[in-house]
Amino acid sequence: IREAVLENAYDIIVTSELNGSDYLEFSIPFKDGKRSYLDNEKKLQITKDIYRIRTVTDDKGEDGKTVTSIYAEAAFYDLAYSEKKSEQTYEAETAEKPMAYALQGTGWSVGKITVSTKRSWQSMDKNALSMLRTIQSIYGGDLEFDNVNVKVLIYSS
């Protein structure tokens, strides 16, 4: 694991919406010595949030200098690429059981849950992230991804 401070990064934009998008965009001079560390799928950390680089684009700026633009998604987006989930039926279950199933085999675990509603429903989602979004929709509350501790939490709104 290589750690480096990207002190020459600029135009840094972090978009983080509750129950929504979470991504990071920034630029760095192409000639920056740390530019070579920035490859697709590498992890980045900004404060306590962890992101995975999805695109690295090199373009000429208006001044003629080459600039590297980075787009990275929060680490939890990896859950969209989890192993395929099979159809599941839940009878009067709290959110914990379907969340545990959704996270099985992903390296993520269930964190604190303050939503105590019981629901009966059938899951037809194909990956962990879409299943977690469905769980949030069915049980209510706010879904939070703790990218540092690799946990998914759901809080009462």
Write out the residue ranges for each language-model feature.
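Short beta-strand-centered interaction patches in the first periplasmic/extracellular domains
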Residues: 57-79, 112-157
